[in-house]
Regions:
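P-loop NTPase catalytic core of nucleic-acid-dependent motor ATPases
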Residues: 1-60, 178-193
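Sparse, context-dependent recognition of short Cys/His-centered cofactor- or disulfide-binding micro-motifs
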Residues: 4, 44, 50, 67, ...
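Structural motif
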Residues: 20, 64-66, 109
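Walker B catalytic acidic pair
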Residues: 23, 68-70
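Single, functionally critical "micro-switch" positions that shape active/binding sites
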Residues: 28-29, 67, 99
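Alpha-helix boundary/capping detector
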Residues: 32-33, 62, 108-111
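Active-site/pore-lining binding-face segments in mid-to-C-terminal subdomains
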Residues: 57-64, 72-75
Length: 194
């Protein structure tokens, strides 16, 4: 199910561009997504800056965004103002020292302690979000570090092994068998017409 959600996200499928990880505190949601967003070279936005008109500005310059720890107030904001953005339709984004720009929001990862998919007041968001639940505490070693660290090398291996299932492209190999550039995650070419 996670692979299907990622594939839809990478292909910019309408209403399939937001993956949410919910669960109680200390289950590793943020750790998991921070490692992924770091690998994908995405940008992080924070709802604590929501009083500023420009808090979503970093999303204008990236293919992947991350909103950590969405509270009930944040979900209310998303439900009120960001539904069209989650649908994949163009929205107007206000940027500091620039004119407002019209963009499609990038693929968005959100972590939350709120089970948004079970809240009836957010029923209009249910079709726009793919929710995964983290129920178990994240295992830590004696020093408080993750027992199973997630690194860029882990993500590289994940995407390399599952590139076919995720329908992602890799740069063509050069004559000596080496890639011409590092692995980059992007949607594959659309299928040809019949």
């Amino acid at each position: 199910i996670f692979l299907s959600a990622l594939r839809d996200m990478f292909k910019n499928t309408p209403k399939r561009q937001c993956i949410v990880f919910t669960g109680p505190p200390n289950t590793g949601k943020s750790y998991f997504v921070f490692s992924l967003i770091n690998f994908l070279q995405g940008k992080v936005v924070s709802f604590m800056n929501a009083k500023s008109h420009f808090w979503l500005q970093p999303l204008a310059d990236t293919k992947f965004g991350f909103l950590d720890d969405a509270t009930d107030a944040c979900w209310t904001f998303i439900d009120t103002y960001m539904r069209n953005g989650l649908d994949g339709t163009p929205v107007c984004l206000d940027s500091k020292h620039r004119n407002p720009i019209q963009i499609r929001l990038p693929a968005l990862f959100i972590t939350s302690n709120v089970d948004v998919d079970k809240e009836t007041k957010y029923s209009y968001l249910h079709s726009r979000l793919k929710v995964f639940h983290f129920h178990k505490k994240m295992p830590l070693d004696g020093h408080g570090n993750p027992l199973y660290p997630i690194t860029d090398a882990n993500w590289n291996s994940f995407f390399t092994k599952l590139e076919k299932q995720l329908d992602i492209c890799r740069s063509p190999e050069s004559d000596n068998g080496e890639s011409e550039r590092p692995f980059r995650c992007c949607a594959g070419e659309p299928a040809g017409t019949l």
